[in-house]
């Protein structure tokens, strides 16, 4: 999705530490392979933790439109429905998104539309809670 949104929003994706420009989806995917923890299922050093947060917060940068937020949420809800989930509570950090210049209306407009479609089309009811990262 990160690649899809960057292309739709005419954004260049770069490696957070090297500044290398990703010119294809496969290059971006290859860079994420280096972010996997050494030990299966856990991060046990500062390098792995830093890499995780670089990828996580880097994803916020490509979310610009209501459609982006809708597509992101629907992707999640479709995956939940495929696992026979009928209710999910979505937690998110609104400050992580608003710090990039995205308005509350843009972000929540996409999420709310996806919530309605998830219930009507996928039979997945959803709730939403925000987490305040910085008070």
What are these regions (language model features)?
Residues 1-135:
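Metal-cofactor-binding active-site regions of metalloenzymes
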């Amino acid at each position: 999705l990160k690649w899809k949104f960057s292309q739709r929003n005419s954004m260049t994706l770069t490696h957070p530490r090297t500044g290398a420009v990703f010119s294809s989806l496969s290059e971006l995917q290859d860079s994420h392979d280096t972010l996997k923890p050494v030990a299966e299922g856990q991060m046990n050093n500062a390098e792995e933790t830093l890499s995780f947060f670089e990828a996580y917060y880097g994803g916020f940068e490509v979310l610009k439109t209501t459609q982006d937020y809708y597509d992101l949420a629907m992707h999640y809800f479709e995956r939940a429905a495929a696992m026979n989930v009928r209710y999910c509570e979505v937690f998110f950090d609104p400050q992580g998104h608003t710090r990039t210049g995205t308005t509350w209306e843009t972000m929540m407009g996409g999420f709310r539309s996806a919530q309605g479609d998830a219930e009507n089309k996928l039979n997945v009811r959803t709730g939403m809670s925000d987490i305040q990262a910085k008070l």
